[in-house]
Amino acid sequence: MFPGGISMTELIIILAVILLLFGAGRLPEAGRALGEGIRNFRKALSGETEVKEVKAEDVKTEERKEEKKEEKEKVEA
């Protein structure tokens, strides 16, 4: 018996139903999505957030690239 009162027979039945619902092809995809959801849930509980630091230099560089691209498109048109 596993923790939570689930026997081996019940676990096999649950896994068979999951296999029938998702199919063998989509099962890895579903597992990946489930794992990502659990990870995001844990991050939310611990208060972690993804914050990307952007330096002013990086922003200026991106703006220059966009301006050059726009100028090039105007010249080509």
UniProtKB/Swiss-Prot annotation:
Q: Name one GO molecular function term.
A: protein transmembrane transporter activity
GO terms for CC?
Answer: TAT protein transport complex
Which keywords does this chain's UniProt record carry?
Answer: Cell inner membrane, Cell membrane, Membrane, Protein transport, Translocation, Transmembrane, Transmembrane helix, Transport
Q: Does the keyword field hold Transmembrane? A: yes
- UniProt subcellular location: Cell inner membrane
Domain of life where this protein originates: Bacteria
The primary location reported for this protein is membrane
InterPro entries listed in its UniProt record: TatA/B/E (IPR003369), TatA/E (IPR006312)
Kindly list the biological process annotations in GO that this record carries.
Answer: protein transport by the Tat complex
Membrane disposition: Single-pass membrane protein
Which intervals of the chain are annotated as region Disordered? 52-77
Q: Where are the transmembrane segments?
A: 2-22
The text of the family note is: Belongs to the TatA/E family.
Say what the protein does. Part of the twin-arginine translocation (Tat) system that transports large folded proteins containing a characteristic twin-arginine motif in their signal peptide across membranes. TatA could form the protein-conducting channel of the Tat system.
Assembly information from the UniProt record: Forms a complex with TatC.
What is this protein's record name? Sec-independent protein translocase protein TatA 2
Organism for this UniProt entry: Aquifex aeolicus (strain VF5)
